[in-house]
């Protein structure tokens, strides 16, 4: 009996990449492949790549080098690079790693079977041309059985001076609401409890779809989508990410307050607290507008959890401008903040500027920001102490098998004693006994919110 071919996928980068990997895994399993955790036992190895940070890109090349050596000993190994590095580098990847069989940009994720058939025909395939994204044609192999990502808009029409995403993920392409709802209904039937709607700029959803309302706004918006999918049977929680401050409206905020399944957690990157830096980044808003958005959210939902992204040491950033970022972080008080020192990316305007800052300055500013972030997150966490929170149980605590772990509506990771086989996928009322900067510990109270 022939042994089934095994595949392995390593994913770098954002939630969009993780969702793409799940879809590609689903295609491979429909083709008869079996998943293996070991990339060196696999017959097909796929690296789904990210270009946002240079260190992630260099790690990909390191992994590829090892697999290229392996392919010399195992010629039937299929070696694939997908995602943003594939899109950006294209055929030049073949010169660097001639052992590659397939190079495919993120727009081609749903075409994996067709592309592999071309590879099996003896071709080295490079698929990076812009296309209209093929609607989901397979069931993704989800990494979780409790929570799931659902893409609602692909691509990005912004042109931030530091970012490669528009060049590698293409222009915005929104899915129609009917397709999104159908995918969520299938997830509900399969027992999933939480869905995160995904987009590079998710609050730009629907701008590219036809039609306007009598009031003159787009017929399809993220706000309308939330109302449309809110009653999907079986889905208990809805989240969305990532939001752009330019498109985050009070109408959207009001909908989130009105719709009980929509969690009070908002991920809205600000990138810098200084208006001159924001202008150089070409972000299209001021720090005053960003503050108004957060104030409006908190006026509707005082307990809302806010997370964001920030970049320090952008080209030309002065000490005073950096301190404006510290001031914004101190005054807003984020529940979580993803921070990074500026990393010049090939093909972006900012990478060509001659006012780059030193690695020493980058390291110093990142350390100072991270110290403040941890301090503010710890302060924000204290509001949970002694409260009862609804926690959706996702898995066992890998560091303590007697505990399960899940997330509150505010997206705070929470641990408590319990049996995973009994509690996985259930929403449990948990009294918080310990509040740390980025996680909570508690005790289950008797009532289960949902069975």
Curated annotation (Swiss-Prot):
- The main place the protein resides is cytoplasm
Give the highest taxon in the source lineage.
Bacteria
The protein's name is tRNA-2-methylthio-N(6)-dimethylallyladenosine synthase
List cellular component terms (GO). cytoplasm
Specify the TRAM domain's residue ranges: 382-446
PROSITE patterns assigned: MTTASE_N, MTTASE_RADICAL, RADICAL_SAM, TRAM
Q: What reaction(s) does this enzyme catalyze?
A: N(6)-dimethylallyladenosine(37) in tRNA + (sulfur carrier)-SH + AH2 + 2 S-adenosyl-L-methionine = 2-methylsulfanyl-N(6)-dimethylallyladenosine(37) in tRNA + (sulfur carrier)-H + 5'-deoxyadenosine + L-methionine + A + S-adenosyl-L-homocysteine + 2 H(+)
């Amino acid at each position: 009996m022939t042994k089934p071919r095994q595949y392995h996928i390593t994913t770098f980068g954002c939630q969009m990449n993780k969702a793409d990997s799940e879809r590609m895994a689903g295609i491979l399993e429909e083709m008869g492949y079996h998943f293996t955790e070991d990339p060196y036992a696999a017959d097909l190895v796929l690296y789904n790549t990210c270009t946002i940070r240079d260190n992630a890109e260099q790690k990909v090349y390191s992994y590829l080098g090892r697999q290229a050596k392996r392919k010399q000993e195992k010629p039937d190994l299929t070696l694939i690079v997908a995602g943003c590095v594939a899109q950006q580098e294209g055929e030049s990847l073949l010169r660097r790693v001639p052992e590659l069989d397939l190079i495919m940009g993120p727009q081609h994720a749903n075409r994996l079977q067709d592309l592999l058939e071309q590879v099996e025909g003896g071709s080295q395939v490079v698929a990076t041309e812009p296309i209209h994204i093929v609607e989901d044609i397979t069931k993704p192999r989800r990494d979780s059985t409790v929570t799931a990502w659902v893409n609602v808009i692909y691509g990005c029409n912004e042109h931030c001076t530091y970012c490669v995403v528009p060049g590698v993920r293409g222009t915005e392409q929104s899915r129609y609401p009917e397709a999104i709802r159908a995918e969520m209904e299938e997830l509900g039937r399969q027992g999933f409890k939480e869905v995160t709607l995904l987009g590079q700029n998710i609050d730009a959803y629907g701008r590219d779809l036809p039609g306007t309302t009598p009031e003159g706004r787009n017929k399809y918006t993220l706000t309308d989508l939330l109302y449309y999918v809110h009653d999907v049977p079986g889905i208990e929680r809805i989240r969305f990410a990532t939001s752009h401050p330019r498109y985050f409206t009070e109408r959207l905020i009001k909908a989130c307050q009105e719709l009980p399944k929509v969690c009070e957690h908002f991920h809205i990157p600000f990138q810098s607290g200084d208006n001159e830096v924001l202008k150089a980044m070409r972000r299209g808003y001021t720090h005053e507008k960003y503050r108004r958005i957060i104030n409006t959210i908190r006026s509707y939902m005082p307990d809302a959890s806010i997370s964001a992204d920030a970049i320090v040491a952008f080209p030309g950033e002065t000490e005073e401008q950096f301190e404006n970022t510290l001031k914004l972080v101190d005054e807003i008080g984020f529940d979580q903040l993803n921070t990074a020192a500026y990393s010049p990316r090939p093909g972006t305007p900012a990478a060509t500027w001659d006012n780059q800052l030193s690695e020493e300055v980058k390291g110093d500013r990142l350390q100072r920001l991270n110290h403040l972030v941890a301090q503010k997150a710890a302060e924000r966490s204290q509001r949970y102490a002694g409260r009862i929170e609804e926690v959706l149980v996702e898995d066992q605590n890998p560091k303590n098998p007697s505990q399960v772990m899940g997330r509150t509506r505010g997206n705070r990771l929470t641990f408590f004693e319990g049996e995973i086989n009994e509690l996985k996928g259930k929403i449990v009322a948990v009294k918080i006994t310990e509040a740390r900067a980025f996680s909570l510990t508690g005790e289950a109270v008797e009532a289960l919110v949902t069975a």
